[in-house]
Amino acid sequence: MSELQSRTSPFSGGLFIKTYGCQMNEYDSDRMAKLLEKTYGLNLVETPEEADMLLLNTCSVREKAQEKVFDELGRWKKWKAAKPNRVIGVGGCVASQEGDVIRKRAPLVDVIFGPQTLHRLPAMIEEALALRTATEQDKKLKKRAIIDISFPEIEKFDNLAEPESNGVSAFVSVMEGCSKYCTFCVVPYTRGEEFSRPFSDVMAEIESLAKQGVREVNLLGQNVNAYRGEMPDGEMADLAVLIHAVRAVEGIDRIRFTTSHPNEMTQSLIDCYAEVPELVSHLHLPIQSGSDRVLAMMKRNHMAIEYKATIRKIKKIRPDLSLSGDFIIGFPGETCDDFKETLALVKEMNYDRSFSFIYSPRPGTPAASLPDDVELHMKKRRLQALQAMLNEQTAAISEGMVGTTQRVLVERLSRNSTNEVSGRTENNRVVNFEGPPELIGQFVDVLIEEAYANSLKGKLVATPEAEQFNQRQFYAL
């Protein structure tokens, strides 16, 4: 037991965390919650009013990220005023990029930490608490938040709490950071260069989760297919090697990975779609634009034809591959012809649920110095046209699933009905269907009967579990 753990906790309330952004931030927030529960006995609560500690885990990828942080902190002022002993912290990518600004503009904030220093939270909190009892001559110190936005890389993973399952599906961070330096992207400046966790550490986490009942793992990274983890023998394992190892873990029957870069889709990784049945027939592979000219300005270092060739290779192995992507609309210099090339690529590739955004300059990136010469009304029109096409494709794929039998991992009770359970298909569709709670954690076959905007409705197909359920329903009549 650490010195902090051995002392009486200074907190009697709970912990409130608000998370913006990507799945990596969700993973980080989960690890923060477990770390602070272990250190201080803090349990997560639903509202700031219930909390002794309020944490904001931020994202700086999209427009007005900094303003969102200060807007939220403005709303938190009343909670600090009502209970001055509350600890307020800001973490994540905005903290990494704007730490000093936050310290100057938001005196209610006690601690500021980056994505790679969240493991130091307990020590930072202790320092912040100590400042509150500082002598009169140290009053100036009281006005300063404790800040640590450095990049210690792997140290973060070495010092976090043991992984604990929150369900039958789990995120596992295998690498962080980015070394691609696309001209529009702030990630290399907020999360640092790419670094990979050692192979044995990743496997130990997955094996621990499997013993706790996890059936599906989602391998995470800003460029997850750039994973290069050192093995015990000194050799380096790439993502393909890791996937083969994960499939051998008892209890793990479904594997996902996200997010990927087209340049890291190696042949060995593509071969996994033929060799690893546990790997889902779904791939999230951002391209950002269908125009080679725009891709060059973005410094993506690949052409549209290379991207399409990669998808075709995988679809030869998995014809049912579900593809999603990311698109940026209105990048500086984008012409109507460039945008038409994006629409043509989307039409050809047939995307299943994708993300599209209007370009906004991110501070400190090379593209921020370019003239933002695409008028806003034009950006909005292009975005509307792209999203209409993407939504049409997604709806058609959902409708095409009606009448098919899908393998579903049952995750929880349905929010729609107490008689239903909810799970996900390989292409990440939520399916609700009648079934007992005992099915949670099981893979079952479900006949899809109806398609809605955000979910599917189905019927349990004959399995031993389904037969038992149907018998109970019959005798209940």
UniProtKB/Swiss-Prot annotation:
<feature type="domain" description="MTTase N-terminal">
    <location>
        <begin position="13"/>
        <end position="130"/>
    </location>
</feature>
<keyword id="KW-0808">Transferase</keyword>
<feature type="domain" description="Radical SAM core">
    <location>
        <begin position="164"/>
        <end position="396"/>
    </location>
</feature>
<feature type="binding site">
    <location>
        <position position="185"/>
    </location>
    <ligand>
        <name>[4Fe-4S] cluster 2</name>
    </ligand>
</feature>
<dbReference type="InterPro" id="IPR006638">
    <property type="entry name" value="Elp3/MiaA/NifB-like_rSAM"/>
</dbReference>
<dbReference type="InterPro" id="IPR005839">
    <property type="entry name" value="Methylthiotransferase"/>
</dbReference>
<dbReference type="GO" id="GO:0046872">
    <property type="term" value="F:metal ion binding"/>
</dbReference>
<feature type="domain" description="TRAM">
    <location>
        <begin position="399"/>
        <end position="462"/>
    </location>
</feature>
<keyword id="KW-0004">4Fe-4S</keyword>
<protein>
    <recommendedName>
        <fullName>tRNA-2-methylthio-N(6)-dimethylallyladenosine synthase</fullName>
        <ecNumber>2.8.4.3</ecNumber>
    </recommendedName>
</protein>
<feature type="binding site">
    <location>
        <position position="93"/>
    </location>
    <ligand>
        <name>[4Fe-4S] cluster 1</name>
    </ligand>
</feature>
<feature type="binding site">
    <location>
        <position position="178"/>
    </location>
    <ligand>
        <name>[4Fe-4S] cluster 2</name>
    </ligand>
</feature>
<keyword id="KW-0819">tRNA processing</keyword>
<dbReference type="Pfam" id="PF00919">
    <property type="entry name" value="UPF0004"/>
</dbReference>
<keyword id="KW-0949">S-adenosyl-L-methionine</keyword>
<comment type="subunit">
    <text>Monomer.</text>
</comment>
<dbReference type="InterPro" id="IPR020612">
    <property type="entry name" value="Methylthiotransferase_CS"/>
</dbReference>
<comment type="similarity">
    <text>Belongs to the methylthiotransferase family. MiaB subfamily.</text>
</comment>
<dbReference type="InterPro" id="IPR023404">
    <property type="entry name" value="rSAM_horseshoe"/>
</dbReference>
<comment type="function">
    <text>Catalyzes the methylthiolation of N6-(dimethylallyl)adenosine (i(6)A), leading to the formation of 2-methylthio-N6-(dimethylallyl)adenosine (ms(2)i(6)A) at position 37 in tRNAs that read codons beginning with uridine.</text>
</comment>
<dbReference type="Pfam" id="PF01938">
    <property type="entry name" value="TRAM"/>
</dbReference>
<dbReference type="InterPro" id="IPR013848">
    <property type="entry name" value="Methylthiotransferase_N"/>
</dbReference>
<dbReference type="InterPro" id="IPR006463">
    <property type="entry name" value="MiaB_methiolase"/>
</dbReference>
<dbReference type="InterPro" id="IPR007197">
    <property type="entry name" value="rSAM"/>
</dbReference>
<keyword id="KW-0408">Iron</keyword>
<dbReference type="GO" id="GO:0051539">
    <property type="term" value="F:4 iron, 4 sulfur cluster binding"/>
</dbReference>
<keyword id="KW-0411">Iron-sulfur</keyword>
<keyword id="KW-0963">Cytoplasm</keyword>
<dbReference type="Pfam" id="PF04055">
    <property type="entry name" value="Radical_SAM"/>
</dbReference>
<feature type="binding site">
    <location>
        <position position="59"/>
    </location>
    <ligand>
        <name>[4Fe-4S] cluster 1</name>
    </ligand>
</feature>
<keyword id="KW-0479">Metal-binding</keyword>
<dbReference type="InterPro" id="IPR002792">
    <property type="entry name" value="TRAM_dom"/>
</dbReference>
<feature type="binding site">
    <location>
        <position position="182"/>
    </location>
    <ligand>
        <name>[4Fe-4S] cluster 2</name>
    </ligand>
</feature>
<dbReference type="GO" id="GO:0035597">
    <property type="term" value="F:N6-isopentenyladenosine methylthiotransferase activity"/>
</dbReference>
<dbReference type="InterPro" id="IPR038135">
    <property type="entry name" value="Methylthiotransferase_N_sf"/>
</dbReference>
<feature type="binding site">
    <location>
        <position position="22"/>
    </location>
    <ligand>
        <name>[4Fe-4S] cluster 1</name>
    </ligand>
</feature>
<dbReference type="GO" id="GO:0005829">
    <property type="term" value="C:cytosol"/>
</dbReference>
